[in-house]
Amino acid sequence: MCLAIPVQVKELLPDNMAKVTLDGVSKIVSTALVDDVKVGDYVVLHVGYALAKIDPEEAERTLALIRERAMGDAA
């Protein structure tokens, strides 16, 4: 099973790259597949590539569900 997760763009870098964060963890990813990415945007990330923009509310709902599921598995 593959999982794509919402992450927030913190910094734009040269060559269609960006620094993104999720729960304090930063990663450099490609934004080549998404037009007009800006700092503060949420993108859906899969294997190092931003696949699409997602609105902040949807990103937060999705992340809350992922966290809830992870906590349920840990219990």
UniProtKB/Swiss-Prot annotation:
UniProt GO molecular function: carbon dioxide binding; iron ion binding
GO BP: any one term: protein maturation
Gene3D superfamilies named among the record's database cross-references: 2.30.30.140
Pathway membership, UniProt: Protein modification; [NiFe] hydrogenase maturation
InterPro entries: Hydgase_assmbl_chp_CS (IPR019812), Hydrogenase_HupF/HypC (IPR001109)
PROSITE patterns, alphabetized: HUPF_HYPC
Pfam families noted in UniProt: HupF_HypC
Entry-linked NCBIfam families: hypC_hupF
Family: Belongs to the HupF/HypC family.
Function field: Involved in the maturation of [NiFe] hydrogenases. Involved in the biosynthesis of the Fe(CN)(2)CO cofactor.
The protein, known as: Hydrogenase maturation factor HypC
Species this protein is from: Rhizobium leguminosarum bv. viciae
Gene name tied to this protein: hypC
